[in-house]
Design a protein with these regions (language model features):
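Hydrophobic alpha-helical segments that form the core
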Residues: 139-179
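N-terminal intrinsically disordered/low-complexity leader segments
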Residues: 1-11, 185-201
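Basic, amphipathic alpha-helical hairpins
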Residues: 23-31, 75-78, 101-105, 130-133, ...
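Amphipathic alpha-helical packing segments from all-alpha helical-bundle domains
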Residues: 89, 110-147, 181
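Hydrophobic alpha-helical connector segments
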Residues: 77-104
């Protein structure tokens, strides 16, 4: 058990070093000019360690985006995470959380890899609604919402966050109040009631 925990810690540390090295290099070099040797030298890891964890530079950036989403989900885990993801407080919390990764987002933008942020938001939307049955059309509505969040967030970051974060959250909330997934909490409550009734049969 201790060996397994130690191995995971070692792997996570290696991945963290690689990610940090890539971000540092993205500040000073063109993304396409960054080599695997550049990354491993800056990170202080071997090429073997690199290829044990990643297939490419894009893989590093996407893996980091997934980590961000997973950590965010873990912080908000519970009924409210799944039922209230379109409330003002949740939107504001999400913006503040992403704001912490401004440097990462700007690096993605500079490298023409900003779509990785959209990829992360799409994953997030599907995750928070996983307990609700969705048709294909409803999934497209979620993609529409994540696309809107992506555009607003990216432009806000590019504008050096001149508008107060509460103003941005209010704008987003104002537009999602009438979104059909705004009734997600009701859908989940009905589903739970039906499950309870079924158990009594």
């Amino acid at each position: 058990m201790k060996t397994s925990v130690s191995h995971k810690f070692s792997r996570d540390f290696t991945k963290s070093c690689i990610m940090e090295a890539l971000l540092q290099l993205m500040h000073s070099k063109d993304y396409n000019d960054i080599s695997i040797t550049d990354i491993t030298s800056r990170a202080g890891v071997s090429r073997m360690a690199y290829y044990r964890n990643y297939r490419s530079k894009d893989h590093i950036l996407m893996d980091y985006m997934c980590q961000i989403i997973k950590e965010y989900a873990a912080e908000l885990e519970g009924p409210k995470f799944f039922s209230d993801f379109q409330t003002y407080d949740h939107i504001l919390w999400g913006l503040k959380y992403l704001q912490k990764y401004k440097d990462y987002v700007l690096c993605l933008k500079k490298a023409n890899r900003a779509e990785i942020v959209l990829y992360g938001l799409d994953l997030y939307m599907l995750h928070v609604t996983q307990s609700v049955e969705k048709s294909s059309l409803e999934k497209y509505e979620l993609y529409y919402y994540s696309g809107a969040l992506y555009n607003i967030f990216m432009h806000w970051i590019e504008d050096n966050m001149q508008e107060d974060i509460t103003v941005i959250a209010s704008i987003i909330y104002g537009h999602v109040q009438h979104h059909r997934f705004h009734d997600l909490h009701t859908q989940m409550e009905n589903k739970e009631k039906n499950a309870c009734n079924f158990d009594k049969l």
